């Protein structure tokens, strides 16, 4: 007999007789690179739609006009970075400004213009049909700006490393084959000596660090190549630029450390003492060289690095994206939905057509996914969960499921000030075995059979530990 698919019957909603005007003093702004179009209710001005250039003086004039029109709420689309100056000015002037996703406010086809867009935003906001995008507090926004700029510096330095590798390969210097990282101790010593004019492979191989896996003879064989002036010139310039970016990274770390100290100083009273780190390790490549755990603990009152997969640097990046106030999301389900780590159910005809997660460029979600990917190789409860899900439905979905579980742990830790204690992979496997045995016993009883332990010959009647 063919199994019937489960039908989803959503609860019917009662339509109101008329939409209520929740924000009668609302305006809509369509942001552009050269000018902003602003719409206020028609009864507030003889010209309810006006345009303002993007110069600072004109933005203040825009705020003055909204004040004269008795506007209290403002809605605008997230258009590139053009919205940031007007958002900050209006927010500082006391307006309740929300930033909305452009996909959520699409107008009807054939009605796309700057004037109609700002009027559409105004009408939707007056009726309370718009939901503002998340934007953390100003202090966290500044921290986010520093760390996003730091990520840009790292990516730019990475592009320079690729160009140096290209120059080496063009000269048939196979240094990347014998050195895992050409910007490590051994690699940089050899590169600087090559740029300085040294060509003898025996001399260059003496720069080998004792921790390098390749032998000195292997390095000598890799450094016999065809030195050409154009490739040496490219190698020299890229190496000099790489050093510049490393200096910029150091300066950026100083700014981040100072800003963290400023944020932590505003917390009163100070939290309890910092717990002992679960594991002691040196900062990895591209991670800050200063103490990150102490100011983060002062800022949040908890130590997120106690959670498996969330090291100090990941905790810093997460807080710069989500902030410290978890009350912005009513529950962990709202939080994971905002991260696009929750299923997006598509139901038609009473049937569930798809439950895939929504594609997104959410930076916090990317951090959770990367942490989940690394957890698969650990002997922790989260690692055991990842391996169980990966065996059942594949690695891609296991990464999403583990990232969602990590996000819930971070949410509850920050909101309720909980302390995470890892039960270990063995405890998780034992709990999972108990759950599987219980389901097997229930299934056997439903079919009129019993479940017997082959090693002892006893009938399984209850949960097995």
What are these regions (language model features)?
Residues 1-465:
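A detector of single, family-specific signature residues
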């Amino acid at each position: 007999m063919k199994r019937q698919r489960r039908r989803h019957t959503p609860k019917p909603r009662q339509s109101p007789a008329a939409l209520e005007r929740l924000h009668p003093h609302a305006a809509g702004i369509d942001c552009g690179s050269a000018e902003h179009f602003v719409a206020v209710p028609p009864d507030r001005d003889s010209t309810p739609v006006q345009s303002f250039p993007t110069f600072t003086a004109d933005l203040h004039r825009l705020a003055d006009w909204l004040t004269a029109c008795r506007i209290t709420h403002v809605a605008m689309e997230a258009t590139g970075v053009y919205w940031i100056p007007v958002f900050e000015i209006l927010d500082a002037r006391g307006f309740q400004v929300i930033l909305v996703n452009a996909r959520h406010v699409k107008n009807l086809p054939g009605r796309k213009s700057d004037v109609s867009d700002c009027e559409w935003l105004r009408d939707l906001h007056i009726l309370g049909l718009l939901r503002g995008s998340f934007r953390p507090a100003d202090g966290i926004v500044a921290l986010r700006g520093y760390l996003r700029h730091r990520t840009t510096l790292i990516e730019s330095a990475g592009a320079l490393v690729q160009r140096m590798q290209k120059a080496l390969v063009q000269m048939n210097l196979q240094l990347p084959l014998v050195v895992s990282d050409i910007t490590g101790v051994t690699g940089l010593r050899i590169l600087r000596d090559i740029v300085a004019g040294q060509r003898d492979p025996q001399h260059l191989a003496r720069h080998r660090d004792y921790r390098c896996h390749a032998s000195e003879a292997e390095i000598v064989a890799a450094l016999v190549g065809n030195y050409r002036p154009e490739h040496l010139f490219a190698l020299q310039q890229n190496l000099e630029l790489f050093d510049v970016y490393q200096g910029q990274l150091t300066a950026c770390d100083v700014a981040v450390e100072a800003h963290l100290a400023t944020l932590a100083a505003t917390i009163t009273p100070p939290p309890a003492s910092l717990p002992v780190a679960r594991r002691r390790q040196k900062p990895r490549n591209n991670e800050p060289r200063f103490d990150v755990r102490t100011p983060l603990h002062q800022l949040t009152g908890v130590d997120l690095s106690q959670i498996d997969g969330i090291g100090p640097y990941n905790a810093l990046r997460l807080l710069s994206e989500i902030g410290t106030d978890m009350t912005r999301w009513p529950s962990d389900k709202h939080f994971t939905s905002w991260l696009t780590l929750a299923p997006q159910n598509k139901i038609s005809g009473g049937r569930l057509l798809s439950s895939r997660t929504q594609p997104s460029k959410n930076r916090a979600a990317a951090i959770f996914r990367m942490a989940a990917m690394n957890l698969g190789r650990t002997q922790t409860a989260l690692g055991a969960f990842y391996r169980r899900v990966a065996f059942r439905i594949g690695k891609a979905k296991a990464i999403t499921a583990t990232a969602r579980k990590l996000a819930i742990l971070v949410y509850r830790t920050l909101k309720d000030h909980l302390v995470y204690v890892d039960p270990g992979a063995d405890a998780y496997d034992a709990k999972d075995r108990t759950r599987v045995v219980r389901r097997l016993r229930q299934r056997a009883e439903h079919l009129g059979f019993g479940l017997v332990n082959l090693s002892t010959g006893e009938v399984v009647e209850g949960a097995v530990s």
